[in-house]
């Protein structure tokens, strides 16, 4: 089963993976990512970690009401220490095979994704629609693709696919409205808004960040 979200997710991964190859990301693997103690090598490993979650997805129990995407991603912060520890462990485990290891994880993720036929699935944080689950994976790629770009200011081109940024910005706008009761003041261009929503840029808004 595949639809437009599947296509967009693959497009963003393909764009990001090509960018990582073009910039020879392993030359920069020890550079700080701007995300706590993570290096860019850790961030590469985290891409595989995030997409590999597709292999864990199952159909939600019959009658399960899907969560909104906003509620789902709002449950991320408590898990952050565990995710950080597991990501660093994965990066160390992959070692010099970092990119090949991530490629293998993504190949497994795509095979699993194509087998997901249920309209409501069960992710780590609860049930949500299949499309919204894929959107959480797209959000990861867009946010972290931008993290790579900001950590490498000498590289002009961004790895973020414009259509993917628009989709993620729209989803985060809906999540903001659900939380605050009003739409965000400004969401275009999409990347500055995504940085605010993801906590990459500080804001006095008490409803931010969203994840």
For each predicted feature, which ranges?
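Alpha-helical bundle segments that constitute or directly flank the non-heme di-iron/ferroxidase center
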Residues: 1-24, 45-59, 104
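Helical hydrophobic small-molecule/effector-binding pocket
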Residues: 77-83, 109-116
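Conserved alpha-helical segments that form or flank metal/cofactor-binding pockets of metalloenzymes
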Residues: 44-84
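A short, structured beta-strand-centered segment in the mid-to-C-terminal lobe
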Residues: 82-104
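Structured surface interface patches that mediate subunit assembly and partner/cofactor docking
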Residues: 1-7, 27-31, 36, 59-69, ...
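Amphipathic alpha-helical interaction segments
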Residues: 42-45, 167
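Hydrophobic alpha-helical core bundles mediating ligand binding, dimerization, or RNAP-core interactions
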Residues: 13, 102, 106-113
């Amino acid at each position: 089963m595949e639809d437009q979200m599947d296509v967009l997710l693959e497009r963003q991964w393909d764009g990001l993976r090509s960018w990582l190859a073009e910039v020879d990301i392993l030359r920069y693997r020890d550079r700080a990512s701007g995300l706590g103690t993570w290096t860019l090598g850790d961030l590469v490993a985290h891409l595989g970690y995030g997409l590999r979650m597709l292999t864990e997805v199952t159909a939600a129990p019959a009658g399960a009401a899907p969560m909104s995407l906003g509620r789902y991603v709002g449950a991320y912060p408590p898990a952050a220490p565990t995710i950080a520890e597991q990501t660093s462990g994965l990066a160390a485990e992959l070692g010099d095979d970092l990119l090949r290891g991530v490629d293998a994880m993504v190949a497994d993720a795509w095979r699993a994704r194509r087998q997901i036929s249920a309209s409501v699935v069960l992710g780590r944080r609860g049930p949500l629609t299949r499309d919204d689950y894929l959107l959480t994976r797209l959000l990861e790629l867009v946010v972290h693709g931008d993290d790579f770009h900001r950590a490498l200011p000498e590289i002009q081109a961004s790895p973020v696919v414009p259509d993917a940024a628009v989709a993620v910005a729209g989803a985060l706008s809906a999540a903001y409205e659900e939380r605050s009761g009003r739409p965000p003041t400004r969401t275009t261009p999409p990347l500055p808004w995504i940085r605010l929503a993801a906590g990459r840029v500080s804001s006095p808004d008490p409803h931010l960040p969203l994840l």
